[in-house]
A protein has these predicted regions:
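Short, small-residue-biased leader/transition segments that mark boundaries at the very start
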Residues: 1-7
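Assembly/oligomerization interface modules of large self-assembling protein complexes
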Residues: 63-149
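Short helix/loop capping segments that flank catalytic or ligand/cofactor-binding pockets
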Residues: 122-124, 163-164, 241-243, 324-325
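Hydrophobic alpha-helical bundles in membrane proteins
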Residues: 137-141, 163-164, 194, 232
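Alpha-helical scaffold segments that mediate packing/assembly in large oligomeric complexes
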Residues: 149-224, 335
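Extended, solvent-exposed, turn-rich assembly/linker loops in the middle of proteins
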Residues: 195-263
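Sequence/fold signature of self-assembling virion shell proteins
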Residues: 246-335
Length: 335
């Protein structure tokens, strides 16, 4: 692990692409450990074992274990980033909405768009030697709006000294969950109102105001064609109305829900409870072609000390935005 020791002394490695994990992997490749007791661990996890830092379980160490040396202290921001990312993944329903994720290194990104007419969608027969019809792909007029979300962690030396890493990880997980919900709210706003390129979602109304019927869901399904209705987002009141439908209350559905927690879904679509969605709205979309997520790096952690007040500080941030791919791949139903 000599190469890894040299790497973690340089905290500037956090600023490189891939962060300290990527830098450690280059100097200490995991493939070198095949067939050994350390197989299955990445370079960062091997560094934790090297410094005997236990981050989970009943015998987890206190946070101060990271600061027993300058080398081990350089691992602390990566531990924070991973714990926050773990919380984001647990609370994240964006994979059910996003067709693709684009990683960028700057702050300016312009997506592409193809807006085929009904004639373009027909894909007419092409005779021998005839010209093949074209579908234009253009860059969007406006840039994707990126939003920076984050939180500053501030703790006294005393709190860190006696805080178990297992419990501290739970706190970081919750911060990750907050970031995931904020990003979900951004995604919903783009689905409903568009990404600034004059592409808001088409709207339709339920047959009876304040009430959701199975016929309304069928209407949403037909209005979305030729796209596939595979995801439905519902606010809390609308979620209750949908689950109260007689079509979703047969005995088999009830037994499955009690046994596994899985709800029967209308028309085979994933039904997602979305408190971030405005009350009185239901969104139906084709997750395979509705939304693009753009992120500038992953979770970024910056760490420093305030000596005069004996405080440790860690700033955790994540920058991301959303762009519509095909406008007609999402519809909003007003209830």
């Amino acid at each position: 692990l000599v190469g890894s020791e040299m790497c973690i002394r340089d905290r500037g490695m956090y600023q490189t692409k891939g962060g300290i994990s990527g830098a450690l992997e280059k100097l200490d490749p995991s493939e070198n450990y095949r067939g050994t007791a350390l197989e299955g661990l990445d370079a960062f996890s091997r560094q934790l074992k090297r410094f005997d830092i236990k981050v989970k379980g009943r015998n987890s160490d206190c946070v101060e274990k990271f600061f027993q040396s300058s080398n081990s202290a350089a691992l602390f921001p990566e531990y924070v980033s991973r714990a926050v990312m773990q919380g984001m993944e647990r609370a994240d329903i964006l994979p059910n909405l996003v067709a693709t994720v684009t990683d960028i290194e700057g702050m300016d990104y312009r997506s592409i768009a193809s807006v085929p007419s009904e004639d373009d969608k027909s894909l007419k027969l092409v005779g021998e030697g005839a010209k093949i019809p074209q579908t234009e792909v253009k860059t969007r007029e406006n840039l994707v709006k990126l939003h920076k979300r984050g939180r500053m962690l501030v703790a006294s030396y005393e709190a860190l000294r006696f805080q178990r890493l297992d419990l501290f990880t739970v706190t970081l997980n919750q911060i990750g969950a907050y970031i995931a919900r904020a990003q979900l709210k951004d995604a919903i706003d783009v689905l409903v109102n568009g990404d600034g390129n004059e592409n808001p979602a088409g709207t339709l109304n339920v047959a009876t105001g304040g009430k959701v019927t199975y016929e309304d869901l069928l209407k949403l399904w037909t209005e979305l064609a030729p796209y596939e209705l595979n995801t439905i987002l519902a606010s809390t009141p609308e979620m209750q109305k949908i689950l109260s439908l007689s079509q979703l209350q047969d005995s088999n559905a009830g037994l499955d829900f009690q046994a596994t927690g899985r709800m029967i879904t209308p028309l085979g679509a994933s039904l997602l409870h979305t408190p971030e969605l405005e009350s009185g709205k239901i969104i139906g979309l084709d997750k395979n072609c509705a939304l693009e997520m753009v992120q500038a790096g992953g979770v970024v952690t910056d760490y420093d000390k305030l000596i005069d007040r004996q405080l440790e500080r860690a700033a955790v941030t994540c920058t991301a935005g959303f762009s519509k791919i095909f406008t007609e791949a999402s519809k909003v139903m007003s209830c």
